[in-house]
Amino acid sequence: MALPITDDDLDGLKQPYVTFSSGSASPPQSTTDAMDLEEQVLDAIKSDAFLVDWVGEDDKGNPQNLPYWRKWVITMSLALYALSTTFSSSVFGAATHVLAEEFALPAETVVLGCTSLFMVGFATGPIFWGPFSEAFGRTRPLLAGYLAFAVLQLPIADARSLTSICILRFLGGFFGAAPSSILSGILADIWSPRERGFAMPTVGAFLTIGPILGPLIGSVLVQSVLGWRWIANVVAIASFFIAVFTFPFLPETYTPLLLARRAERMRHMTRNWAYRSKSEEAQSSIGDFAERYLLRPARMLALEPILLMMTLYVSVSFGLLYNFFLAYPTSFIQERGWDQTTASLPLISILVGVIIAGALLSFTTNSRWAPNAKEGRPQETRLLLMMVGAVSLPAGMFLFAWTSSATMNPWPQILSGIPTGFGIHLINMQGMNYIIDSYKIYANSAIAANTFLRSLFAAGFPILATSMYAAIGVKWGTTILALLAVAMIPIPILFYYFGAKIRAKSKWQPPL
């Protein structure tokens, strides 16, 4: 029969071994008894009795139990980080022709250096920021990345060559990717799955609103007495302002790190070194890192039809969004003769479409348009709204293309941005949500692959658009891209009917 293990027994293991002389008053225990006791102590240590976890559902240390107002402060802080970094991704597009004249370079080269390289950095950043957020918690990588992003804006304002701007823009994208890489983890830390249905569309809307505001505000700055260099200064000032007023309200939310800190406190308070958290038991190697953050996302993207096709569709729609940041100014300046600031105002219609789509997603969170296993609605239910967006996007693009003539009233072309923005946001959000629903515990790997490809498309489309619009004009260039959007329509329809069967055959299908 096993002897009961007490803290005194565990404390005994911390003491040095005691040797007995021939004159000892009492003889030592036999070697067998000592070994049996040690085995019992070790078994007790290995048991869950000393495993530190949350104490009940109401544990105040659990980020899920933060006050409701505090959760929304955190959520809106993340939305502001996303807004400022994605704003920076597109804002220099407004200075393309000014920079081309100042540095005597082709417009395509300026687009490559100022917009595309930023998005390449934005694509590579998550490879590092994701692991950092799991190794060091959420707040430290978030703070480090965001502040570095803000600081890197300052030398851009004094840059004397496009090469310097290119390097700084790439680094700005790399560090600016930190909030976008970490925010989904923080939202999962503090919100329940049902509550995330309201929080995620809010942050997602800011991720799309940011790049839309970039050309609008950038055009105003470029045309003002401040000039293009103040674009970087404005981004820096806004980012520092956001950081100062939000970081004091951001607690650490990563559960493994919080439990490890609690276990450390308990060890020091009780002098019982058996207390530990699950994360402290895990041993990670470079091979584990490569598998989790590099190899698995690549394999999933190559072997998973759902991930591959959904990522392709989301990436195309995201690339089309960045394409319009050039299409609108090109059409309204070159074909209608508007000045740059006025020509950027029609982009507001895309913003309106995004806001309408975001509101629709929030209002339908608990409706028949959303998945609900208890009511028999599978993950594929999300694709219903995605189908609506799939039709809306090319419809808006065709309207934009075929009303772009200077002889036609500009309002149809201006208002075409509403169905365009509406469609882009529905495709992006519902596509991402469907990926998360489909892979659950492997969602981080799936989203990493998605983010990488999506950012590369956003980097490539502006270069493509610059050359294409110069060669064949806005009407036919946008028509070709609209046909590409039409070709994507069958994707959500296909997975709506066959997605469940495809998921059942997946190697990465999570257990029920």
Swiss-Prot record:
A GO CC term attached to the entry: plasma membrane
UniProt cross-references to PROSITE patterns, sorted A to Z: MFS
Domain of life: Eukaryota
InterPro entries: MFS, MFS_dom, MFS_trans_sf
Alphabetic keyword roster: Cell membrane, Membrane, Transmembrane, Transmembrane helix
Transmembrane segments: 72-92, 110-130, 142-162, 170-190, 202-222, 230-250, 306-326, 343-363, 383-403, 407-427, 456-476, 480-500
The keyword Translocase appears for this protein: no
PANTHER family linked to this entry: MAJOR FACILITATOR SUPERFAMILY, MAJOR FACILITATOR SUPERFAMILY (MFS) PROFILE DOMAIN-CONTAINING PROTEIN-RELATED
Homology family: Belongs to the major facilitator superfamily. CAR1 family.
Official protein name in the record: Cercosporin MFS transporter CTB4
Natural source organism: Cercospora beticola
Organism ancestry: Eukaryota, Fungi, Dikarya, Ascomycota, Pezizomycotina
Gene field: CTB4
